[in-house]
Amino acid sequence: MPNSVTPRPMSSRRQWLVAIGLVAITVVLAALRYSPWRLVWNITPSEPRGLYLVHVTGPVPVSHLPYGALVQFHYSCPLIPARVTRGPLAGITRLTCLDRHVAPYPDGTPFVKRVEGKPGDILTTRRGCVTIRRRDGTVRALGCALRRAPDGRPVPYHMHWNDTRIPRGQFYAGSTRVPQSYDSRYFGLVRRQQIIGTVQPVWTTAKRY
């Protein structure tokens, strides 16, 4: 019969260290709960995976956000016209949520994207590809809408801009890091009322390029 091993009791010093550590963690979590700062972990490829710090400001003037700034905002499902194919309403066109076809995100889902376009900038779509002419005259490509989602599903709809000027209080949210980013190419411009706060990387697995 094997000899039984009696676990050693934890030393008083070690108990104190564990207790102090638990108290410190509790204090930090409580402070974060009531502070304007939040920690979030990004798992999407639009930005490098890792830990980010959100400064919860609520709606702020879009003019105060610099180009390239990381912003967290509440996603709002865009409505698109779709023809009903079954039932008593067959043949009638009604508005339906775009994310049923592209990305199953419910309204209010927090998104983190970069500010690529601001009020006064002009958006143009040519053959599904979006370019922006900023107020200083610079022109920047913002990517092309995909015909198929990463899982192979067809993408039936994307935003189309015909030299459209971004109105006051709205911005273009995007990511030029990966072509499959789900951004303003599909769900349109973001209103300032959707803004949660600005975001700073704390620790990430890769550098943005």
Describe the residue ranges of each PLM region:
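Protein maturation boundaries and topogenic segments
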Residues: 1-110, 185-209
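Acidic/glycine-rich C-terminal interaction modules and beta/coil loop segments
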Residues: 149-199, 203-207
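Short hydrophobic-aromatic micro-motifs
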Residues: 52-54, 72-73, 124-125, 167, ...
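Short amphipathic beta-strand/extended segments with alternating polar/hydrophobic composition
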Residues: 137-151
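Short, flexible surface segments
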Residues: 66-70, 119, 167-168
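Mid-length scaffold segments of soluble, non-membrane domains
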Residues: 105-141
